[in-house]
């Protein structure tokens, strides 16, 4: 059968949950599914199999959900569809009614079920009675027969070796959020997205258990049950070391960590976030022989925060020459091989506004108008700040020898794909 990944989408085609089984198809390919489906529907040629390039989407609709399997190969379609309907059957037995709300309210147990239902693209355990023997309604594993031996005794913690020793026991926690933004030439935000991750550097002796607590606001949002006006974290993924059943029960992120660097958790936030650095640009032409570009940058984040290493890349015509610059802060340089002016600002406080003017000789303005202009790109990094408001409340480190360890937390918001189109 060989399915590469399985997605569950809401009625608008937005991914609620997904499981990548083989890694040979980019998870972003699912973005093409809904536009394809709507196009075929309008043409009156809708089929249960849709294709985009080499990627095939095999899908069914149930209630207000789309279940989609992706594959590169000429898979056995009847088996794939049989498996998708089996997912519906199993989930319906677990959650009584299979709909968007039941997926959002039970995302941890859904992940566990998807892990058991399929392995490397092939159906594994699809009998709901067998699944219910060790995946309970609360997401706990039932203990059958003899009591279980702790994983550390059997060395079942494959991601961590025994006998690790450090003179100084420390844990460094980085909460990093990247801002993806696309603004059109009229100033309207076309895309606004936050991609976040919690990364750890672990220097701990022995076989410690760590418990990480996040602020309550975020925990409620992770469950999908928040009634208050709040942002919602999506596509939440945990490292394999996290005890999902424990998290599902009391929202505690409990784990025995790998040694060194690893990503504990990742998430996405799709919401209209106010652009942190706003750019306005004006182009003035003079006698078809020179052009003046004026760029205004404004920090639209808290005044007590500072953006570091700001780089604003402004496209210029390919035949521009004789550059001259004037900046209210920072420095500007012309990079002819990229047809770009890079305006660098070492430190950009929130609420501040700065100006840069660039003058170029321009022998052929008309040519540039036909070609159009690439967008302005912005790079930045803001420490001690997250857009989502996620915060680490505590980190408990438990190890049988009873040593004291120091946890350090750092928050960083940085630019991802941050572009503003120009007219």
Swiss-Prot record:
GO MF annotation terms: clathrin adaptor activity
Pfam families assigned to the protein according to its UniProt record, in alphabetical order: Adap_comp_sub (PF00928), Clat_adaptor_s (PF01217)
Residue stretches making up the MHD domain: 168-421
One GO CC annotation: clathrin adaptor complex
SUPFAM superfamilies xref list: Second domain of Mu2 adaptin subunit (ap50) of ap2 adaptor, SNARE-like
Database matches in InterPro entries: Adaptor_comp_med_subunit, AP2_Mu_C_sf, AP_mu_sigma_su, Clathrin_mu, Clathrin_mu_CS, Longin-like_dom_sf, MHD
Record PTM text: Phosphorylation of membrane-bound AP1M1/AP1M2 increases its affinity for sorting signals.
Coiled-coil region(s): none
GO BP of this protein: intracellular protein transport; vesicle-mediated transport
CDD domains attached to this UniProt entry: AP1_Mu_N (cd14835)
Record's bilayer topology term: Peripheral membrane protein
Similarity-based family: Belongs to the adaptor complexes medium subunit family.
Known function: Subunit of clathrin-associated adaptor protein complex 1 that plays a role in protein sorting in the trans-Golgi network (TGN) and endosomes. The AP complexes mediate the recruitment of clathrin to membranes and the recognition of sorting signals within the cytosolic tails of transmembrane cargo molecules.
Quaternary structure note: Adaptor protein complex 1 (AP-1) is a heterotetramer composed of two large adaptins (gamma-type subunit AP1G1 and beta-type subunit AP1B1), a medium adaptin (mu-type subunit AP1M1 or AP1M2) and a small adaptin (sigma-type subunit AP1S1 or AP1S2 or AP1S3). Interacts with P2X4.
Listed name of the protein: AP-1 complex subunit mu-2
Species for this entry: Bos taurus
Upper classification of the organism: Eukaryota, Metazoa, Chordata, Craniata, Vertebrata
Gene this chain is encoded by: AP1M2
């Amino acid at each position: 059968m060989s399915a590469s990944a399985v997605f569950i989408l809401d009625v608008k085609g937005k991914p609620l949950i997904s499981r990548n089984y083989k890694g040979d198809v980019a998870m972003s390919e699912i973005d093409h599914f809904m536009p394809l489906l709507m196009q075929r529907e309008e043409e009156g040629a809708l089929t249960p199999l849709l294709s985009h390039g080499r990627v095939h989407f095999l899908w069914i609709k149930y209630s207000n959900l789309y279940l989609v399997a992706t594959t590169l190969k000429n898979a056995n379609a009847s088996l794939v569809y049989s498996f998708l309907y089996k997912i519906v059957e199993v989930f319906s037995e677990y959650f009584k009614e299979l709909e968007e709300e039941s997926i959002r309210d039970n995302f941890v147990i859904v992940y566990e079920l998807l892990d058991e239902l399929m392995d490397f693209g092939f159906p594994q355990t699809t009998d709901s009675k067998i699944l219910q023997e060790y995946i309970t309604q609360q997401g706990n594993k039932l203990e059958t027969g003899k009591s279980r031996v702790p994983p550390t005794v059997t060395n079942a913690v494959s991601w961590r070796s025994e006998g690790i020793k450090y003179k100084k026991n420390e844990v460094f926690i980085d909460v990093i959020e990247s801002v993806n933004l696309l603004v059109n030439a009229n100033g309207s935000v076309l895309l606004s997205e936050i991609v976040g991750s919690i990364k750890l550097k672990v220097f701990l002796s022995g076989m410690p258990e760590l418990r990480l607590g996040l602020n309550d606001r975020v925990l409620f949002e992770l469950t999908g049950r928040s009634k208050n006006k709040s942002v919602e974290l999506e596509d939440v993924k945990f490292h394999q070391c996290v005890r999902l059943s424990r998290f599902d029960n009391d929202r505690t992120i409990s784990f025995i960590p790998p040694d060194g660097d690893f990503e504990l958790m990742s998430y996405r936030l799709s919401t209209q976030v106010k652009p942190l650095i706003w750019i306005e640009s004006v182009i003035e032409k003079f006698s078809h022989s020179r052009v003046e570009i004026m760029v205004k940058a404004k920090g639209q984040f808290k005044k007590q925060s500072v953006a570091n290493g700001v780089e604003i890349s402004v496209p210029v015509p390919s035949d521009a020459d004789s550059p001259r610059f004037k900046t209210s802060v920072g420095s500007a340089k012309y990079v002819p091989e990229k047809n770009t002016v890079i305006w660098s600002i070492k430190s950009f406080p929130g609420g501040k506004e700065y100006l840069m003017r660039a003058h170029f000789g321009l022998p052929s303005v008309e040519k540039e108008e036909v070609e159009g202009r690439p967008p302005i790109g912005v790079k930045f990094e803001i420490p001690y700040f997250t857009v989502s408001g996620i915060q680490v409340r505590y980190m408990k480190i438990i190890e049988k020898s009873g040593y004291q360890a120091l946890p350090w937390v750092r928050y960083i918001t940085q630019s991802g794909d941050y572009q503003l189109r120009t007219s």
